UniProtKB/Swiss-Prot annotation:
Consequence when changing residue 183 to F: No effect on interaction with CSK
Keyword Phosphoprotein: yes
Organism, as annotated: Rattus norvegicus
Posttranslational modification: Palmitoylated. Phosphorylated by FYN on Tyr-314 in resting T-cells; which promotes interaction with CSK. Dephosphorylated by PTPRC/CD45 upon TCR activation; which leads to CSK dissociation. May also be dephosphorylated by PTPN11. Hyperphosphorylated in mast cells upon FCER1 activation. Phosphorylated by LYN in response to EPO.
UniProt GO MF annotations: SH2 domain binding; transmembrane receptor protein tyrosine kinase adaptor activity
Gene field: Pag1
Lineage: Eukaryota, Metazoa, Chordata, Craniata, Vertebrata
Parts of the chain on the Extracellular side: 1-17
Record's protein name: Phosphoprotein associated with glycosphingolipid-enriched microdomains 1
Bilayer disposition of the protein: Single-pass type III membrane protein
Length: 424
């Protein structure tokens, strides 16, 4: 039993050793795989950390716009920024010819002097080179902005204005505003003209009747727009139009024209009779005053008229003189030389001459003694009555037919026909 038992025990020991060896091998395998997984995870963790660090470094590096965003007129250049504009070189950076050319171009742009910048602009502050895009124009919102724009237009740079771009913006906006306000539309001026001529339709109609084509020429002023270079913006134009409408209308409207000139001319015979009733000897002086005033008005309307034409145009008929030269049935004064002189001096009995005017005071002064033996105590009044009666008889001609009523003014055609006769 001894050797058999020892053999069994040795077989069991071998089985145990195989089992423990296999267990150890399996354990070692699992341990190695676990360590490999741990190492791979560590490698994976390290790789994203390196990439994130590179990304953060790239984001912290200033861009090209930030590197060259300083004022263009400053002469100082940043050497450090120009030398380190691309940042620190890393393994992933690739240098090419394009990148080097862009770096050199930026460096040359920084090295330009203020004299070159001033040469690139003309006297008005406008760049000579063509720009690809148009700068925005912001209208002034308050008085401070308006003062700044006016100062920039005059050439005085404000406290916060730097560089050529601000100057270009201000000059272009100012030019556009001035160009917008140079010309006014015809519609606006027609509206103003309608307002000014709304309450004066009667005066304009009388003006057209009296002046004719002259008034029509003045009425056409609303067809063209006026140009005012002193106005700098539409707001100032509107303000001036609102505030100065009354003054402009008063200045533009012509002086009032007397509308009742025709009525006065039609009523002149009645006024002449009343004047003769009050003071008969002073009638020629009153007529001469009236002639001088009318000739003055005609000279204003047409300065080319001469004194002779004006006097011929406004020569009137003295009715007391006509009746005084004609012998009446009730008057005792006989003037045998009156009718032949009148026929020789004028072509008919409707017109009076200078000789008749000169003789009218004598004839009128001779009438009152003729009526003194009468019944009425006022001989002057009776003499004027007889004159009026004789005036009523004047339209009846020698042949018995009616003569058209005479006018106070002679027509130009009759004057031209009878000029040689009246000068005798």
């Amino acid at each position: 039993m001894g050797p058999a038992g020892s053999a069994l025990s040795s077989g069991q020991m071998q089985m145990q050793m195989v089992l423990w060896g296999s267990l150890a091998a399996v354990a070692m395998f699992f341990l190695i795989t676990f360590l490999i997984l741990l190492c791979s995870s560590c490698d994976r963790d390290k790789k994203p950390r390196q990439h994130s660090g590179d990304h953060e470094s790239l984001m912290n590096v200033p861009s090209d716009k930030e590197m060259f965003s300083h004022s263009a007129t400053s002469l100082t250049t940043d050497a450090l920024a120009s030398s380190e504009q691309n940042g620190v070189l890393t393994n992933g950076d690739i240098l090419s010819e394009d990148s080097t050319m862009t770096c050199m171009q930026h460096y040359e742009e920084v090295q330009t002097s203020a004299s070159d910048l001033l040469d690139s602009q003309d006297s008005t502050g406008k760049a000579k080179c063509h720009q690809s895009r148009e700068l925005p124009r912001i209208p002034p919102e308050n008085a401070v902005d308006a003062m700044l724009t006016a100062r920039a237009a005059d050439g005085d740079s404000g406290p916060g204005v730097e560089g050529p771009y601000e100057v270009l913006k201000d000059s272009s906006s100012q030019e556009n505003m001035v160009e917008d306000c140079l010309y006014e539309t015809v519609k606006e001026i027609k509206e103003v003209a309608d307002k000014s001529q709304g309450g004066k339709s009667k005066s304009t109609s009388a003006l057209k009747e009296l002046q004719g084509a002259h008034a029509e020429g003045k009425a056409d002023f609303a067809e063209y727009a006026s140009v005012d270079r002193n106005k700098k913006c539409r707001h100032s134009t509107n303000a001036e139009s609102i505030l100065g409408t009354s003054s402009d209308l008063d200045e533009e409207t012509p002086p009032p024209v007397p509308v009742k000139l025709l009525d006065e001319n039609a009523n002149l015979p009645e006024k002449g009779e009343h004047g003769a009733e009050e003071q008969a000897p002073e009638a020629p002086s009153g007529h001469s005053k009236r002639f001088s005033s009318l000739s003055y008005k005609s000279r204003e309307e047409d300065p080319t008229l001469t004194e002779e034409e004006i006097s011929a145009m406004y020569s009137s008929v003295n009715k007391p003189g006509q009746s005084a030269h004609k012998p009446g049935p009730e008057s005792t004064c006989q003037c045998p030389q009156g009718p032949p002189q009148r026929s020789s001096s004028s072509c008919n009995d409707l017109y009076a001459t200078v000789k008749d005017f000169e003789k009218t005071p004598n004839s009128i002064s001779m009438l009152p003694p003729a009526r003194r033996p009468g019944e009425e105590p006022e001989p002057d009044y009776e003499a004027i009555q007889t004159l009026n009666r004789e005036d009523d008889k004047v339209p009846l001609g020698t042949n018995g037919h009616l003569v058209p009523k005479e006018n106070d003014y002679e027509s130009i055609g009759d004057l031209q026909q009878g000029r040689d006769v009246t000068r005798l």
